Amino acid sequence: MKWLVLLGLVAFSECIVKIPLRRVKTMRNTLSGKKMLNSFLKEHAYRLSQISFRASNLTIHPLRNIMDMLYVGNITIGTPPQEFQVVFDTGSSDLLVPSINCLSPTKRPCSKQDKFKHHQSSTFRFTNDTFRIYFGSGTMRGFVAHDTVRIGDLVSTDQPFGLIFLESWLDIPFDGILGLNYPKISFSGAIPIFDKLKNEGAFSEPVFAFYLNKDKQEGSVVMFGGVDHRYYKGELNWVPLIHPGEWSIPLDRISMRRKVIACSGGCEALVGTGTSLILGPRTVVENIQKHIGATQQCFEYFVSCSAVYALPSIVFTINGINYPVPPQAYLVKDSRGQCYSPFQVNRANPSAENWILGDVFLRRYFSVFDRGNDRIGLARAV
C-alpha cells in the first residue's frame, strides 16, 4: 500500500546521510471525511527510503508525516530488498511487518499494507519462536524470523524481526513498526536493530535523534550515530532517564498562565515518537480541555480555530527547564476546517500520573536519545 509518494530529492552535507520526504493526503483527513475517525481513535489508542548518502558514522534518514502528526520512513528487508513504510517508535522495541500470509481474525487478508514475501528472499530464515501482542480491543500474533534489513545505507544482516501472521488493525497508512526502545521491553525477545548495529560498531556514538518538521510535506529526519547541530537552536539540555532501559524522563510540572495544572508533585513522561498526541491521566486531560475551551465530540476535543490567538502556551517543565508549547503548535486543523486538541486520555493507564509526549511536543523540540549515557537531550527545533 502506497499512501505516500517520496520525492527523489537528496541533500548532502559533511558526515550526513539525508533522505528527504514528502507528505500527501493524510489518514486523519481521509477518516474524517468518511466519518470513521472516532471509531479509529476508540479502537486504536496508542500502543503503539529512497535515496541515501553516507559519510563518516552519522546516518540521517528521512521521515514522512502522515495522519497530520505521524511520521514514517522506508526500510527494506530481504534479498532482493522489499520496501516497507514503518513508524520509528521510541515506545517499543520490535521490528514488526506483516507476512504475505497475514490474516485478520475474520480470516480475511490483513490491511492493505505491503507484506513481506519470505519465499522471494534468499537470505531469509525461519525460527520456531513465536510472539503475541495484546492492544486495545485486538491482538497481534507472529513468529520471529531473520533477514537482511537496511535503513538507508545502514545494513543489519541476519536481523531478527517479527513477522505478523494475525492482526486486527484497521486499514493503516503504514506497513509496520521499527522499535527504538531498549531490549528489555521487546515482545518478541529479538535484539532490536539499533542494538545489533551498535554492537557491530556501525555507530561512532550510540545515539539517535529526531527532527520532526512542522511542514506538511518534507524535511523530517531520524539520524543515527550522531547529531546534526543545524536542526536545533541553542544548547541541548540533557535529562537522565528515570529507569535506564526505557525512554521515560521526570516531568516536574505542567503549567498554564504560570499556574500548575498537572504533575504538581512531579511525574514521569515517556518520550514517544510513535504517537501523534500528548497523552495523560483522564482527570488532568479533562481539566486541560476546560482550560482551553475544548468541547468533546465522541473521542475528540474540538476548539474554535479563532481561539489560537487568545489561548496561552502550555509549559512542560523538565529537569528544571521550561518547554512551552504554544497554541499554534497544539491546535491542529483537519480537512473539515475544525481545530482539535491533541491532549488525549492515556487509555493504557487512564488513572496514573504518567504521560506520553508525542509528536505535538517533538515537532517543537529536537530530541536526542543517548543509549551510552541513558539520557535524552532536548533543544528548540529550527
Curated annotation (Swiss-Prot):
**Matches recorded under Pfam families:** A1_Propeptide (PF07966), Asp (PF00026)
The tissues where this chain's protein is expressed are given as: Trophoblast and placental tissue. Produced specifically in the invasive binucleate cells of the placenta.
* Residues carrying a glycan: N57, N74, N128
Major subcellular location class: secreted
Which pairs are disulfide-linked?
C102-C110, C263-C267, C305-C339
Q: Which InterPro entries match?
A: Aspartic_peptidase_A1, Aspartic_peptidase_AS, Aspartic_peptidase_N, PEPTIDASE_A1, Peptidase_aspartic_dom_sf
User: Which GO biological process annotations does it have?
Assistant: proteolysis
- Give GO terms: molecular function aspect only: aspartic-type endopeptidase activity
A GO cellular component entry from the record: extracellular region
Q: Where is this site: Ancestral active site?
A: G272
Q: Which UniProt keywords apply?
A: Disulfide bond, Glycoprotein, Secreted, Signal
Function description: Has no proteolytic activity.
PANTHER family per record: BETA-SITE APP-CLEAVING ENZYME, ISOFORM A-RELATED (PTHR47966), PEPSIN A-5 (PTHR47966:SF49)
Query: What family is this?
Result: Belongs to the peptidase A1 family.
Kindly provide the name given to this protein in its UniProt entry.
Pregnancy-associated glycoprotein 1
Source lineage: Eukaryota, Metazoa, Chordata, Craniata, Vertebrata
